[in-house]
């Protein structure tokens, strides 16, 4: 493997000194870029793009050609794992992801098998190894998965949900069934992420998109407990260096201390959290990633630069901060505004790393 030319992102996650704050964006390879839209049209549809390792590599690299980002993230989807479990994933126009066979009974859960990441998810591993090769040491490659709770919400509901009625009913009326599902998912995700590391991923991120829908106690029981199980089972050293792990619960600002106790290296913050407060609470234990509101990228460029300055000042001096948005970049953002955001982070952050 080529030697890493820019390891700023990995160093910040491990709270090692850096010359400036590293930056990348969730969904940086995506619908806001015209070149992405062209590649997706070439693939035919979203899942065909995910399953073609050469095209998945192409869209992963597209934002790096435009911007001086400090990391690449594998182009894939969090629902690859449930799809590999045989649920029949498809995408409906305007409706988002749907499953032909929802996992909403204990009998359906019992029948689920844990997918072999090199077999049923081999297309993801081929994408990881291709991207790692093509990056040629330019920046590190982030691998990722959805959290067990988040994957379970789609599997039980049969797709996206605003109320989470079916899975919450299962959580409170049939908790043993949900725990069985979450346990299988935790095992599947651990294997999946470790296979990504074996194929070249240099950092890992777990997206708990829907953990914030849970009550205070239910979050610990149904979400955090299973992310903890994954963290305990991950490969944390490869290619002669540590493989940092970031946990991100959208709407998880209440639980930062508990998340930091899992042994992860970093926590992702959404835009509702004050980064200065988050650093006071957990910054001695973990690095922090975030957390500008993605909608700020619609603002005039001087306002974007001002917001970047405020967040950098909120975190303050020293390492342990990876700048990011508080969630994925919106599809209608002007790519020039994204570029101005990235430049502002690098330019304004040097003063905090003397």
UniProtKB/Swiss-Prot annotation:
Domain of life: Bacteria
Lineage: Bacteria, Pseudomonadati, Pseudomonadota, Gammaproteobacteria, Alteromonadales
Pathway: Porphyrin-containing compound metabolism; protoporphyrin-IX biosynthesis; coproporphyrinogen-III from 5-aminolevulinate: step 4/4
Signal peptide span: none
GO CC list: cytosol
CDD domains according to UniProt: URO-D
Localization: Cytoplasm
EC number, UniProt record: 4.1.1.37
NCBIfam families membership: hemE
Enzymatic reactions: uroporphyrinogen III + 4 H(+) = coproporphyrinogen III + 4 CO2
Purpose: Catalyzes the decarboxylation of four acetate groups of uroporphyrinogen-III to yield coproporphyrinogen-III.
Record-marked site positions (Transition state stabilizer): 77
Swiss-Prot/TrEMBL GO biological process terms: heme biosynthetic process; protoporphyrinogen IX biosynthetic process from glutamate
Positions that bind substrate: 27-31, 46, 77, 154, 209, 327
Complexes and interactors: Homodimer.
Record's keyword terms, sorted: Cytoplasm, Decarboxylase, Lyase, Porphyrin biosynthesis
Family membership: Belongs to the uroporphyrinogen decarboxylase family.
GO terms for MF: uroporphyrinogen decarboxylase activity
Protein name: Uroporphyrinogen decarboxylase
Species whose genome carries this gene: Shewanella oneidensis (strain ATCC 700550 / JCM 31522 / CIP 106686 / LMG 19005 / NCIMB 14063 / MR-1)
Pfam families assigned: URO-D
Enzyme class at the top of the EC tree: lyase
């Amino acid at each position: 493997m080529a030697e890493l030319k820019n390891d700023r992102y990995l160093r910040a996650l491990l709270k090692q000194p850096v010359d400036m704050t590293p930056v990348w964006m969730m969904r940086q390879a995506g619908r806001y870029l015209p070149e992405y839209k062209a590649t997706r049209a070439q693939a035919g549809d979203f899942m065909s793009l995910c399953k073609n390792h050469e095209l998945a590599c192409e869209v992963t690299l597209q934002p790096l050609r435009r911007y001086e980002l400090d990391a690449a993230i594998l182009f894939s989807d969090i629902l690859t794992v449930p799809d590999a479990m045989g649920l029949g994933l498809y995408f409906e126009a305007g409706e988002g992801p749907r499953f032909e066979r929802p996992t909403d009974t204990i009998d359906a859960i019992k029948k689920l098998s844990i997918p072999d990441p090199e077999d049923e998810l081999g297309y993801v591993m081929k994408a990881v190894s291709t991207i790692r090769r093509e990056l040629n040491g330019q920046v590190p490659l982030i691998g990722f998965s959805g959290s067990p709770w988040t994957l379970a919400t789609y599997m039980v509901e049969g797709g996206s949900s605003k109320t989470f009625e079916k899975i919450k009913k299962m959580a409170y009326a049939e908790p043993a069934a949900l725990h069985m599902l979450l346990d299988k998912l935790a095992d599947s995700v651990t294997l999946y992420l470790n296979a990504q590391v074996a194929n070249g991923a240099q950092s890992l991120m777990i997206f708990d998109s829907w953990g914030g829908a849970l009550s205070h106690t239910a979050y610990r029981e149904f979400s955090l407990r299973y992310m903890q199980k994954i963290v305990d089972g991950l490969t944390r050293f490869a290619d002669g260096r540590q493989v940092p792990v970031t946990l991100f619960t959208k709407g998880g600002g209440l639980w930062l201390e508990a998340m930091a106790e899992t042994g992860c290296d970093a926590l992702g913050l959404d835009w509702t959290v004050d980064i200065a407060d988050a650093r006071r609470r957990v910054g001695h234990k973990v690095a922090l990633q975030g957390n500008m509101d993605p909608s700020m990228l619609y603002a005039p460029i001087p306002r974007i630069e001002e917001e970047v300055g405020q967040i950098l000042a909120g975190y303050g001096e020293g390492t342990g901060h990876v700048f990011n948005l508080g969630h994925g970049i919106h599809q209608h953002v002007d790519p020039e505004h994204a570029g101005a955001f990235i430049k502002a982070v690098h330019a304004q952050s040097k003063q905090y790393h003397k």
